[in-house]
Amino acid sequence: MSITKIHAREILDSRGNPTVEVDLYTAKGRFRAAVPSGASTGVHEALELRDGDKSRYLGKGTVKAVDHVNKDIAAKLIEKKFSVVDQEKIDHFMLELDGTENKSKFGANAILGVSLAVCKAGAAEKGVPLYRHIADLAGHKDVILPCPAFNVINGGSHAGNKLAMQEFMILPIGASNFHEAMRIGAEVYHNLKNVIKAKYGKDATNVGDEGGFAPNILENNEALELLKTAIEKAGYPDKIIIGMDVAASEFYKAGKYDLDFKSPDDPARYITGDQLGDLYKSFIKGYPVQSIEDPFDQDDWAAWTKFTAAVDIQVVGDDLTVTNPKRIQQAVEKKACNCLLLKVNQIGSVTESIKACKLAQSNGWGVMVSHRSGETEDTFIADLVVGLCTGQIKTGAPCRSERLAKYNQLMRIEEELGAKAKFAGKDYRHPKIN
């Protein structure tokens, strides 16, 4: 079944910034997709096209990207009469139309909007759920419910506090299914709120962009201490591990790292990559920290390689790899990390996202599917993580509807699968896939 109409519009994301939404029509109906956007972005990401007109949305408008869909992509795509199940053909056609290495002509936000909508239409065309269609595209017989990674304490570029490290997460890997993982996550979140309120006062429980708390603390181990207390109070010390997203590129200065980067600059306090690595090792020793994302700058390859060789935890590449097969290949060769953070808008199409995922998995890496800090109510990544069988997803705290939209969709998927539902749990790094 081919596409009859495509219409893009500008909508607002969860931070009040414009983003692209695409409606795609076939004889089966209308299929809608919205594109997310990040705050801490890697320099190697595909280009998100913004208007740059300061008189409108402070320069963040997406009218140009919307126009590219409506005026450049739509007619040419419809003319080709591709079947919507041919995801790869359609994505490659758009990439050829754009013709640039990083999608800078149309913008990754234009191409991805269409790509996501095509994927939803393809599932409807086959009469299967979206997660099943994605599993087929990836060549998987199985589908797997992921372990959620709830970002419950925010720092870095996501928060107005002095905390340098961007995310402190809880992963309920000891849960027996996804529903239980949600309950554990929510209960720890509520306990954490009470712990923070008791220690720092009521205004310390205001939430950040991703629904986590952003108490005004400076020391990163203080955040870990708060998590440890909340996990114990909730009664789940044996079921939860801690994950971190350091986003170290945000505080990399002159070859060193500034753990107080939100204060006036003082090079005397900068630390080396080795010192930062030792700090992480102390976290791993003192707390159940089992996953660290972006521990070093996106181009500090030596520090990555040294650290990954020295620890047995999950080391996740985000700014390092930006879901880009070329960067992933480089990281594989250098043994820089052992897990890919998969963000569809970093690479800009469904086909390339699947390719990046398969490349990582074929090299023995784990894969964690991720939201962005500027999200929408679109739930595509919930189906994506189930279909790609990656075993882990991070899409914020159990708070704020644009985050819960994904978690709730995962609960619906688990319910729909019934007795066939498999939960990654303790195998979150390497789920058993058929």
From Swiss-Prot:
Co-factor note (free text): Mg(2+) is required for catalysis and for stabilizing the dimer.
Catalytic activity of the protein: (2R)-2-phosphoglycerate = phosphoenolpyruvate + H2O
MF annotations from Gene Ontology: magnesium ion binding; phosphopyruvate hydratase activity
Keywords: Allergen, Cytoplasm, Glycolysis, Lyase, Magnesium, Metal-binding
GO CC terms, sorted: phosphopyruvate hydratase complex
GO BP term, example: glycolytic process
Main subcellular location of this protein, as a coarse class: cytoplasm
Magnesium recorded as keyword: yes
Entry EC number(s): 4.2.1.11
Subcellular location: Cytoplasm
Function, in words: Glycolytic enzyme that catalyzes the conversion of 2-phosphoglycerate to phosphoenolpyruvate.
Family according to the record: Belongs to the enolase family.
Designated name of the protein: Beta-enolase
Species this protein is from: Salmo salar
